[in-house]
A protein has these predicted regions:
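A ubiquitous, low-specificity "background" feature that marks scattered single residues
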Residues: 13, 21-23, 44, 243
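Bacterial N-terminal signal peptides
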Residues: 17-30
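Transmembrane beta-barrel domains of Gram-negative outer membranes and organellar outer membranes
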Residues: 35-302
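N-terminal secretory signal peptides that target proteins for export/translocation
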Residues: 1-15
Length: 302
C-alpha cells in the first residue's frame, strides 16, 4: 500500500512540475511592473516597493470547531530591498477564551519576483522560516490534514517547539483594477519525521478606483474625499489544504478550507484597513473567522 501511495504521489508531483513549466513559459510575455500593497490576508503577490517599509497589524477572531473560541494577532514588518526582493519578520500571539494570552513565535520571510517587468504570469518564489510553538494558531496558511484548534493543555503546547520551512510558488496578474493571485504552499518540518504538508491560497480583487487610476498614469489626479467609494477595494479569498507527501490532493472533509469576501479601504497612499469575514467549508474547518488588519507604508517614495 505504501509503495502504491508513493507511486501516485510521484506521478502527481511530476504532473505538477509540468504545470510549473507551462507557467514559466507563459511568464515570458513582458509588460510594466508596479509595486503595490498586497490586499489579502493569506495569499501573497506584490513585492514591497524598493527602500520602503510595510508595517501590518493583523487580528483574527475565530469560532473554534473544537475547544474554546480564540483571538489571534500577527505583527509584520516587510522591507523592499530592491524592486523585486522583499524581506520581513512576523511575530504572533493568541488569546483563547478562558486562558491567558500566549506568545506563538516568530517568522522570517523573503520573496523574490523573478522578472523586472510585468508578465502574463508574474512569478515569485517565497521562503519562510517559522520558529513557533504548539500554541501558535494564526492562519498565515493552512496545510496538511485535520483541524488546528488547540486541544492539548496550553502549558504543554507552549513548550512544544514547531520549526518549519515554508515555500510558496506565487503567480499573479493584473487586468486593470482586477488582480488574480494563486499561491501553491509547501510546509516542510525541520524536526523529525521531516515530512511536508501542502496548501493553497487563491484571490481575486478589484483595487480601489482611486489607486487603480493613479497606477494607470493619473497620479496627479485630486485625492477623493476621506469617505468615498473610490477608496474601497473588494474581492474574494479562498485558502485550504492539499494533503501531505503520502496523500496529495483534495480530501475535502479531512482538510481545512475557507472562503470569504475581502474589503480594503485606503485612507491615503500610506494607510489602509482591511476586513475579511471567512467561513469554513469542511468538517474540520473552524466555522467562522473574522479577519482584520491595518497597514502602513513608508519609505523613499511615500
Amino acid at each position: 500500500m505504501g509503495s502504491t501511495l508513493r507511486t501516485v504521489s510521484d506521478r502527481t508531483f511530476t504532473h505538477g512540475k509540468g504545470l510549473l513549466l507551462v507557467g514559466l513559459l507563459w511568464a515570458t510575455i513582458p509588460g510594466s511592473l508596479h509595486a503595490q500593497m498586497d490586499p489579502y490576508f493569506t495569499a501573497i503577490n506584490y513585492p514591497v516597493e524598493k527602500q520602503s517599509f510595510m508595517v501590518m497589524a493583523l487580528s483574527d477572531l475565530q469560532v473554534a470547531r473544537y475547544g474554546n473560541d480564540f483571538a489571534t494577532g500577527m505583527f509584520m514588518v516587510q522591507y523592499g530591498v530592491t524592486p523585486q526582493w522583499t524581506v520581513g519578520v512576523m511575530a504572533e500571539g493568541q488569546k483563547i477564551s478562558g486562558m491567558p494570552a500566549t506568545y506563538g513565535g516568530i517568522r522570517l520571510n523573503t520573496y523574490i519576483h523573478l522578472f523586472r517587468d510585468d508578465r502574463l504570469l508574474n512569478l515569485t518564489l517565497y521562503g519562510e522560516y517559522e520558529d513557533l510553538n504548539g500554541a501558535a494558531l494564526y492562519k498565515m496558511e493552512v496545510a496538511g490534514f485535520g483541524p488546528e484548534d488547540l486541544t492539548e493543555p496550553l502549558s504543554l503546547a507552549r513548550e512544544t517547539s514547531v520549526r518549519t520551512f515554508e515555500q510558496r510558488v506565487i503567480v499573479y496578474h493584473d487586468w486593470g483594477r482586477l488582480n488574480a493571485t494563486f499561491n501553491f504552499i509547501r510546509e516542510t518540518a525541520l524536526q523529525a519525521p521531516h515530512g511536508s504538508d501542502y496548501g493553497y491560497a487563491l484571490g481575486f480583487f478589484f483595487k480601489p478606483s482611486w489607486t487603480g487610476e493613479s497606477m494607470a498614469g493619473m497620479a496627479d489626479m485630486a485625492a477623493p474625499p476621506a469617505l468615498s467609494m473610490s477608496r474601497l477595494g473588494y474581492g474574494l479569498e479562498m485558502i485550504g489544504a492539499l494533503g501531505d507527501n503520502e496523500r496529495f490532493g483534495f480530501y475535502w472533509n479531512s482538510q481545512q478550507h475557507y472562503v470569504g469576501p475581502v474589503f480594503t479601504y485606503d485612507f491615503s497612499s500610506r494607510w489602509s484597513v482591511r476586513l475579511e469575514p471567512a467561513v469554513g467549508l469542511s468538517d474540520v474547518s473552524d466555522p467562522f473567522v473574522l479577519r482584520m488588519g491595518v497597514a502602513y507604508m513608508f519609505g523613499t517614495h511615500h
